[in-house]
A protein has these predicted regions:
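Hydrophobic/aromatic beta-strand elements that line small-molecule binding cavities or substrate pockets
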Residues: 81-87, 101-103, 118-124, 137
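Short solvent-exposed loop/turn micro-motifs enriched in small/polar/acidic residues
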Residues: 10, 79-81, 115-116
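A solvent-exposed, acidic/Ser-Thr-rich amphipathic alpha-helical stretch
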Residues: 5-6, 24-91
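Short, low-complexity N-terminal intrinsically disordered segments enriched in polar/charged residues
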Residues: 1-37, 110, 143
């Protein structure tokens, strides 16, 4: 059996490569159909009472359209991601990855969208493959 931590690390790296390569299909393949993605209004809003759902529950067509639009209108300046922790459930059927993200997008007009902070990515092993079921929005921790 392959080490679950190594498998999760591979999924995180696959997601990073998908952003780097603007590969919508690979991004979409990572998500479980029940994926939800709560997002804090700012990277400093640690209290989940303020969080919102920008994209709602996973919808392949809708989420794909959002990312195709992003890729068509923005250049990727940099995409730095560092895995800080991977934890696997005792039964090996669930996991989380704590990832520090620093991704900068820029439009041709110079407008920037900076994704910076720490994420908790939650995965379940479904039919032998790891799929993301939840991902917190990026939070700054002053580290």
């Amino acid at each position: 059996m392959t080490d679950a931590r190594s498998e999760i690390e591979e999924v995180v790296h696959r997601e990073t490569r998908a952003w780097d390569e603007r590969d919508v299909e690979t991004l979409l393949s990572i998500f479980h159909p029940d994926m939800v993605w709560p997002w804090p209004p700012t990277p400093h809003d640690h209290d989940p009472m303020t969080w919102v759902f920008v994209m709602g529950r996973f919808d392949r067509e809708r989420w794909g359209a959002v990312w195709r639009e992003l890729f068509a209108t923005h250049d990727l300046v940099h995409n730095h991601r560092t895995i800080r922790r991977i934890e696997v459930t005792p039964d090996g059927d669930g996991a989380l990855a704590i990832v520090d993200v620093d991704t900068l997008w820029r439009t041709p007009a110079g407008m920037e969208s900076h994704w910076k902070g720490r994420a908790c990515k939650v995965y379940a092993k479904v039919d032998g493959a790891w799929q993301m079921t939840m991902h917190t929005g990026l939070l700054e921790y002053g580290l």
